[in-house]
A protein has these predicted regions:
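Polytopic transmembrane helical bundles with strong interfacial aromatic enrichment
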Residues: 2-353
Length: 353
């Protein structure tokens, strides 16, 4: 990564204000991570449809009076989720789910504010300019698009006869968050101090594959969450007694393409298989880096990533066996983003040297 023509080494030796850009980008990544965890809690507590309107500005204020709470509750009562799932819910219970969704949206507003203020400050101070400024601005625009995607996802759960958001739109929402998080970490990492380590192209390609498979695994995990596939087939290593379920189970839904979204057998099977593939590729990459780049920070990063993936796999298996209790579901989602962050930082550091 260059800063309007500066090399990574020159960035490190540039004035202190330039290094504040790196700290700010890592702060943005931490906020996105927090947003993902709060979003996971919002989903797991069934709170995502409690606010039935999208009002980016005025929606920042929660109900402040009994009358305002009653009005918000009546709006929730008008959607199918209340009538088909939560009929008879008390106002206190509604407030519980409302606060989760409101907090999720409020955190999104805070992220936008921190990004906007930080971007303006760094541009005015001269720390951000040229291609780097344009690139970072693009990340901000992705964040704005993410807010719109979030509302499209919520709106998919407000339709008649529907009690939850569409799995494919949940996948899009989480994958966009993962993409923004990845790019923030990669840009910030590449602005760090070079270590003088030269990575072969084969190592860089393998690290890219690990990063891609991690993103894919998160996307497939979102489909598991959206289709509630984690609440069924709660056994491991077998799925309903099969290592590989028969075709009549994997493709029981018509048309064929819908099996990849709505068939809980295939959705969970895909998530399992991609996890095995990710672990295998990470192990191979760890061996590769150990052979080609021994006694380097790259070797340490690749090894750490393997162990993080192993821990995440164990958490995933336990989460499945216990049918996704709240705390385990949150831990599994948070751990996935820790793995992703490590994979992104590792890949970016290989470019930095």
């Amino acid at each position: 990564m260059t800063h309007d023509g500066f090399s990574a080494s020159e960035i490190w030796h540039a004035p202190q204000r330039l290094r504040t850009v790196r700290i700010w980008l890592f702060l943005m990544a931490a906020l996105v991570f927090t947003m993902v965890v709060v979003g996971g809690a919002t989903r797991l507590t069934g709170s995502g449809l409690s606010i039935t309107e999208w009002n980016p500005i005025m929606g920042a204020l929660p109900p402040l009076t009994d009358a305002a709470w009653a009005e918000a509750f009546e709006k929730y009562k008008a959607i199918p989720q209340y009538r088909l799932v939560n009929e008879g819910m008390a106002l206190a219970d509604f407030k519980f789910i409302f606060w989760w969704e409101w907090s999720h949206r409020q955190l999104g507003r805070a992220i936008g504010l921190v990004f906007g203020m930080g971007f303006l400050w760094n541009v005015v101070s001269g720390a951000l300019r040229g291609r780097l400024a344009i690139y970072v601005l693009g990340l901000g625009l992705l964040g704005g698009a993410q807010g719109t995607i979030g509302w499209i996802m919520v709106a998919s759960g407000l339709k008649e006869g529907v009690t939850a958001v569409a799995p494919i739109k949940l996948m899009l929402h989480l994958t966009m968050a993962a993409t923004i998080y990845t790019l923030l970490i990669m840009v910030a990492t590449r602005m760090g101090k070079p270590r003088g380590e030269i990575a072969p192209q084969s190592v860089k390609r393998a690290a890219s594959l690990v990063l891609f498979l991690t993103l894919l695994q998160i996307a497939l995990g979102a489909l598991v969450a959206g289709s509630k596939a984690g609440l069924v087939w709660n056994t491991w290593p077998f799925l309903d007694g099969h290592l590989v379920p028969p075709a009549e189970m994997l493709f029981s839904v018509s048309p064929l393409i819908e099996n990849f979204v709505d068939n809980t057998v295939l959705v969970q099977f895909n998530h399992r298989m991609s996890a095995y593939l990710l672990l295998a590729v990470a192990l191979w990459h760890g061996w590769q880096v150990g052979r080609l780049m021994p006694h380097t920070s790259a070797n340490r990063r690749a090894s750490i990533n393997v162990w993080l993936i192993v821990v995440q796999a164990v958490i995933g298996i336990i989460t499945l066996l216990y049918a996704v209790p709240l705390w385990l579901g949150l831990l599994h989602q948070a751990s996935a983003f820790i793995v992703l962050g490590m994979a992104a930082a590792h890949r970016a550091a290989l470019v930095r040297g």
